[in-house]
């Protein structure tokens, strides 16, 4: 338990961290990865080069300082971080390394303002946060290992099937190389996949949603969008261009707190943008397999027909089941695109225009996609009277999955 004096000192640094947080985190990563180059394989080097990782850490450190009097406000964030850490293989011993370089960076960046008293306060605050994360991660590791077919760390999986879903998205069907079982998981969860990236000379992990419902015997499926450019697309490009059927990938156990609550029977509205449809398809397949008659809406946005993944599968489910309705938006409609078959609406997703279809009593809303898409849909749902606790979201990007 932190003393009132420690909490006051840490909280007093929140404005400074908001102003200088990115300088601090840039210095921190340079210092830590320079002294511990083996850790480069834990971190997304694309996000390191773009600055996204530094921005995310700066925001997290400032938020922790701001809410140090009541860190329970940040429990959802802590839960999300813990799941990602377990998928990456972060261990308790890594926290000592991070703490050493974080405290040294605070002293070096803040200069004379970083008194011994302030550094001691931040050491205590960091210790509290580290203990919280280590404890939660220990429980997640134990749960992953105890499931039938479960494991911890990296496990070799063979690509048994590689299927294009659109011009940008390809599905990889993965089976354990040891011939063993795969564990059950929750719709919406993800795995980390680790590949060697020759351009970096490093193993690099990325998180990919499991795009099929739980229960596929002996296999897991991920559906990967080819990201443009470098460094953003280094891993997805490797998967698309260099990984073929028969090749072996390192895969983590399923993790993630963005999951479907299917037990209460409430209506479900699934809203996705681009490759954000991958966890939604897992949720949709799970719900339709349950066949409990609840109302289900599948709303999807994509740029055009060429990048519309899994169209035939979604159309078939909607045609077969009267409780499932779809609303697909194309930003650009081609001359050969058929309304009601290929797409349903032209332009960007407009929930106000389809409010009679998607605003259902007591419904749960699941959102996944790029940040601007997510922000727009959250605002629209709030405008339409949907309670905040009914909205569940996963952002694809830093801190999220892809």
UniProtKB/Swiss-Prot annotation:
Q: Which UniProt keywords apply?
A: Detoxification, FAD, Flavoprotein, Heme, Iron, Metal-binding, NAD, NADP, Oxidoreductase, Oxygen transport, Transport
Identify the residue position(s) of the site Involved in heme-bound ligand stabilization and O-O bond activation: 29
Q: Please list the residue ranges annotated as the FAD-binding FR-type domain.
A: 152-261
Residue positions of the active site: 95 (charge relay system), 137 (charge relay system)
Q: Which cofactor does it need?
A: heme b; FAD
Q: Where does heme b bind?
A: 85
Query: Catalysed reaction per UniProt?
Result: 2 nitric oxide + NADPH + 2 O2 = 2 nitrate + NADP(+) + H(+); 2 nitric oxide + NADH + 2 O2 = 2 nitrate + NAD(+) + H(+)
Any idea of its EC number? 1.14.12.17
For the ligand (FAD), the binding residues are 190, 206-209, 395-398
Homology family: Belongs to the globin family. Two-domain flavohemoproteins subfamily.
Q: Output this protein's name.
A: Flavohemoprotein
Quote the gene name from the UniProt entry. hmp
